[in-house]
């Protein structure tokens, strides 16, 4: 296992955090807990062997590191943890960094040594392929092939699972589809400006201009709003461009495979320079939130709820209901239009699904797969917990009124959000609209709101599936520094107004061209070896 490179280099695939964050030593396992980690890794990870279902030992304890897609403290994670332990008889320890810092803290945890690694983690995109390449993840291929879920007849996501295989092996399990982002526009703002939903980039830019210079919120003041906001000019994970698709269009800031089967770095192409020019022009005109560079997703959502801007590219499906509910709770008009992709964008991108992965230091990976991951889709009480939460905390069937809506005895409904009072929950970790296994007893099927269905339909009918980028030794070595440099170049051009020619001269002088070509060569070498 090549984890020694991680320990020495701090796991370059973590995309080189731009700020220092504290690690997770307080939740670390003791050294004795992983004394046999190397032996376990060699026997299970390298061979892909897995025990039969009836031979799997139930773990006494499972430690997981997760982001805020899993129940947070504010949403009574303690109640979730207690219920999970009641259902399994297993002690569950949850390590949960701030959502926007998750991959940074995870990288620091990996770099601190296998004795500190959790048993299971949530990964996505290049983080998944990178950690797999480094030997940090357990090969769960046979565990999945031998699982009760696969043979149950209920599983419908074979294409999703197959898309996550690396050289035919599965190192992480997706429990839902990947989903993606759709551009939402406040209808009232369009109406106030006398506009219709844009279908081209020129119309889109004209809308941003009107939302910035006019009076779209109808408060009688021109110019006290702006067009859009985003959590950075480039995402924190693949597909990188999903928060600003109208500006990127056909450009891509990282590695992709052409129709000819040859890998290339999209950052070095002319169409990426054109995308930078579009972003810089819109930013200079004031159409884009001046805090975009440092925004987190929560910052953007709060500004949207406060009616500071009118165009927000965010997740399809249940997030349409979340956005609507929060606008209403802030006293603003809540009707949103999910746009079809403008002509120059063509299609939205469905990201590769986030996965649950088991680290190679885990002493009982088969047990963790069975009792933690596979059980999430059991079509029963555990799936209920991961989808809707805890009864009488996050959902209920009692006769009551929630936010002015009366429910009868026995009628399933979601409770008022603990984190965002004035709104109702829509889901927990599992999104029922992205399900990859049938669940006949799903009590919340009828509770999915029309706006969520509409947004998901717009996305599903106008998206393409992203594919994972394989990792190589060169990718693991250079891509962290390369992405840091790329983000710096983008910030210089868009925010500081640096000329594109000067910015790309720095890209070459600071090593970007060399790193990029080295990675491209390694990807094409790997491709030709298939």
Task: Outline where the language-model segments fall.
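Sec-dependent N-terminal signal peptides
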Residues: 5-16
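Conserved N-terminal structural module of periplasmic/extracytoplasmic solute-binding proteins
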Residues: 8-10, 25-203, 255, 263-267, ...
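Short, solvent-exposed loop/beta-turn-alpha elements that line the ligand-binding surface or hinge
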Residues: 54-55, 139-156, 196, 250-270, ...
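Conserved small-residue motifs centered on glycine
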Residues: 67, 370-491, 497
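Helix-loop-helix "hinge/cap" segment bordering the ligand-binding cleft or interdomain interface
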Residues: 165-238, 255-299, 303, 358-370, ...
């Amino acid at each position: 296992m090549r984890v020694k490179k991680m320990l020495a280099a701090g796991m370059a695939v973590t995309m080189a955090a731009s700020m220092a964050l504290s690690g997770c030593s307080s939740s670390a396992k003791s050294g004795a807990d992983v004394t046999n980690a190397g032996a376990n890794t060699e026997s299970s990870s390298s061979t892909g062997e897995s025990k039969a279902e009836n031979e799997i030992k139930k773990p006494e304890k499972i430690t997981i590191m997760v982001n805020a897609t899993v129940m947070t403290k504010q949403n009574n994670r303690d109640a979730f943890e207690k219920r999970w332990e009641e259902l399994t008889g297993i002690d569950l320890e949850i390590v949960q960094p701030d959502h926007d810092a998750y991959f940074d803290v995870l990288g620091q945890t990996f770099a601190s040594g296998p004795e500190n690694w959790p048993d299971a983690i949530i990964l996505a995109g290049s983080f998944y392929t990178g950690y797999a390449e480094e030997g940090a993840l357990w090969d769960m291929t046979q565990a999945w092939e031998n699982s009760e879920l696969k043979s149950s007849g209920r599983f419908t996501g074979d294409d999703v699972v197959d898309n996550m295989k690396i050289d035919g092996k599965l190192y992480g399990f997706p429990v839902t589809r990947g989903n993606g982002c759709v551009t939402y526009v406040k209808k009232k703002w369009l109406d106030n400006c006398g506009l219709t939903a844009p279908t081209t980039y020129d119309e889109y830019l004209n809308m941003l201009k009107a939302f910035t210079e006019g009076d779209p919120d109808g408060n009688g003041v021109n110019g006290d709003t702006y067009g859009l906001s985003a959590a950075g000019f480039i995402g924190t994970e693949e597909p990188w461009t999903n928060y600003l698709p109208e500006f990127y269009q056909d450009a891509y800031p990282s590695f992709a495979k052409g129709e000819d089967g040859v890998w290339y770095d999209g950052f070095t192409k002319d169409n990426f320079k054109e995308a930078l020019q579009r972003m810089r022009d819109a930013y200079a005109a004031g159409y884009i939130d001046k805090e975009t560079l440092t925004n987190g997703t929560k910052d953007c959502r709060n500004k949207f709820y406060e009616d500071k801007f009118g165009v927000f590219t965010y997740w399809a499906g249940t997030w349409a209901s979340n956005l609507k509910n929060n606008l209403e709770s802030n006293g603003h008009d809540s009707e949103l239009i999910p746009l079809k992709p403008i002509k120059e964008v063509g299609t939205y991108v469905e990201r590769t699904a986030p996965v649950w992965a088991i680290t190679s230091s885990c002493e009982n990976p088969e047990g963790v797969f069975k009792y933690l991951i596979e059980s999430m889709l059991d079509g029963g009480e555990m799936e209920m917990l991961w989808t809707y939460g805890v009864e009488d905390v996050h959902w209920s069937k009692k006769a009551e009124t929630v936010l002015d809506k009366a429910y009868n005895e026995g009628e399933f409904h979601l409770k008022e959000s603990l984190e965002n009072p004035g709104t109702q929950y829509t889901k927990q970790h599992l999104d029922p609209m992205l399900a990859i296994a049938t669940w006949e007893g799903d009590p919340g099927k009828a509770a999915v709101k029309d706006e969520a269905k509409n947004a998901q339909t717009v996305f599903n009918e106008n998206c393409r599936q992203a594919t994972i980028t394989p990792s190589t030794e060169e990718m693991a070595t250079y891509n962290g520094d390369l992405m840091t440099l790329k983000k710096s170049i983008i910030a210089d051009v868009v925010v500081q107004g640096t000329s594109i020619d000067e910015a790309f001269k720095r890209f070459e002088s600071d090593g970007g061209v060399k790193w990029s070509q080295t990675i491209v060569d390694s990807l094409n070498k790997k491709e030709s070896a298939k």
